[in-house]
Amino acid sequence: MSLCIKLLHETQGHIVTMELENGSTYRGKLIEAEDNMNCQMRDISVTARDGRVSHLDQVYIRGSHIRFLIVPDMLRNAPMFKVGPGRSVPLPTRGRR
């Protein structure tokens, strides 16, 4: 299982933001995430591409429709990102430091 999928499973129970391929943004509590990134969320605020905001109680999003995810900052300290025995350097990340 990849690091990204492990991180997605760690976010279960937390508030996440997802942008879909169609440009809409979903922000709510992640209830369940599958290995293929299919996600179930509750108490969602949906922002359409044109800026309209609506509310949904529950939604199931197909993983192949997700463009990107924004996860809580507190997961920055998740154990999977720590340098462990046999690993001399932290895992590479994208972007600047």
From Swiss-Prot:
InterPro entries: LSm4/Sm_D1/D3 (IPR027141), LSM_dom_sf (IPR010920), Sm (IPR047575), Sm_dom_euk/arc (IPR001163), SmD3 (IPR034099). GO terms for cellular component: catalytic step 2 spliceosome; commitment complex; cytosol; nucleus; post-mRNA release spliceosomal complex; precatalytic spliceosome; SMN-Sm protein complex; spliceosomal complex. Belongs to the 40S cdc5-associated complex (or cwf complex), a spliceosome sub-complex reminiscent of a late-stage spliceosome composed of the U2, U5 and U6 snRNAs and at least brr2, cdc5, cwf2/prp3, cwf3/syf1, cwf4/syf3, cwf5/ecm2, spp42/cwf6, cwf7/spf27, cwf8, cwf9, cwf10, cwf11, cwf12, prp45/cwf13, cwf14, cwf15, cwf16, cwf17, cwf18, cwf19, cwf20, cwf21, cwf22, cwf23, cwf24, cwf25, cwf26, cyp7/cwf27, cwf28, cwf29/ist3, lea1, msl1, prp5/cwf1, prp10, prp12/sap130, prp17, prp22, sap61, sap62, sap114, sap145, slu7, smb1, smd1, smd3, smf1, smg1 and syf2. Belongs to the snRNP core protein family. GO terms for molecular function: mRNA binding; RNA binding. Plays a role in pre-mRNA splicing as a core component of the spliceosomal U1, U2, U4 and U5 small nuclear ribonucleoproteins (snRNPs), the building blocks of the spliceosome. The keyword Cytoplasm applies. This is Small nuclear ribonucleoprotein Sm D3. GO terms for biological process: mRNA 5'-splice site recognition; mRNA cis splicing, via spliceosome; spliceosomal snRNP assembly. PANTHER family: SMALL NUCLEAR RIBONUCLEOPROTEIN SM (PTHR23338). Residues 3-75 form the Sm domain. The keyword Nucleus applies. Keywords: Cytoplasm, mRNA processing, mRNA splicing, Nucleus, Ribonucleoprotein, Spliceosome. It is found in: Nucleus; Cytoplasm, Cytosol. It comes from the Eukaryota. It comes from Schizosaccharomyces pombe (strain 972 / ATCC 24843). Pfam families: LSM (PF01423). Coiled coil: none annotated.
